[in-house]
From Swiss-Prot:
It comes from the Eukaryota. It is found in: Nucleus. GO terms for biological process: DNA damage checkpoint signaling; DNA repair; intrinsic apoptotic signaling pathway in response to DNA damage; nucleotide-excision repair; telomere maintenance; telomere maintenance via telomerase. This is Cell cycle checkpoint protein RAD1 homolog mrt-2. Its main location: nucleus. Pfam families: Rad1.
Length: 267
């Protein structure tokens, strides 16, 4: 039987009372098998990238957990984010809790999920040294347009995108945010006016348009479903930043950011 080490023999020890919330957060970025897990006294960060076009990061504050102990300045490891997401999703019961234990470098991360009825699941996840992460060099000083909006309308727009379209073109203007697909049924455009109740603020220094692979935008579907607000930005190179805020109640929130490079129209 696997037991979880506790105390000074571990460098990271976490507990979350509602495992479903943690499972949902991991699921938002589990589009590739492995990713990097960072932890410090400031919180936890999970980063996943596809090696070329997209990088996603989850930021979780210590207050999200019922217990959060990190005994080194920074803990970093490469680990299977997808396997952890699947393991945490075993229990859909909000009364289930999870304990996490990590002894240190090259040791496995151990997880113990328990519910009020005594049901228990144990997970053991291999770790290796963290890889160097992609850096899209997103420059805040080079941002051309910023939109703060509620996610409800975008959930519906993304759900209705034409799957036969290779790309989605996004037009960033002062008056609206426009999405256009080019599929078997032809060209389809949906716009969110700046005066819409879904749009809280708009800052557009220059009106531009860029195209992105539809498959990359669809990777954000879970984040769109869970989040209540989104800050959408684009820089002068067309790198798209989507920053999602997930409200967990009682003042607790987690944040997800997707950075996506524009598609090469000549491909």
């Amino acid at each position: 039987m696997m037991e979880l080490e506790t105390g000074q023999c571990t460098i990271m020890e976490l507990k979350k009372e509602n495992v479903k919330e943690l499972a949902q957060v991991f699921k938002t970025v589990a589009f590739k098998d492995t990713g990097t897990w960072h932890a410090s006294e400031a919180g936890m960060k999970i980063t996943v990238d596809d090696g070329s076009y997209q990088l996603a990061s989850v930021f979780i504050n210590p207050a999200f957990f019922s217990s959060f102990k990190v005994r080194e300045e920074i803990v970093s490891m490469k680990i299977s984010i997808k396997s952890i997401s699947e393991f945490l999703s075993i229990s859909e019961n909000s009364s289930s809790s999870v304990k996490v234990s990590y002894p240190g470098m090259f040791q496995p991360v151990k997880m113990l999920v328990e519910d009020a009825d005594g049901w228990v699941a144990r997970g053991n996840f291999t770790t290796t040294l963290a890889d160097q992460e992609l850096d899209f060099e997103f420059d805040d000083a080079g941002v051309l347009a910023t939109y703060l909006l509620k996610t409800q309308v975008l959930k519906e727009i993304i759900k209705d995108f034409d799957d036969t379209s290779r790309t989605v073109r996004i037009q960033f203007t002062k008056n609206s945010l426009c999405f256009t697909t080019f599929g078997d049924v032809g060209e389809t455009t949906v716009s969110i006016p700046s005066r819409s109740l879904q749009m809280e603020s708009v800052k557009c220094l220059e009106e531009v348009e860029f195209s992105y692979l539809l498959s990359l935008i669809q990777r954000m579907t879970t984040a769109f479903i869970l989040a209540t607000k989104l800050i959408l930005r684009v820089d002068e190179r067309g790198v798209l930043s989507c920053q999602f805020s997930i409200d967990h109640g009682e003042g607790n929130a987690s944040y997800i950011e997707f950075l996506t490079v524009p598609a090469d129209e000549e491909e």
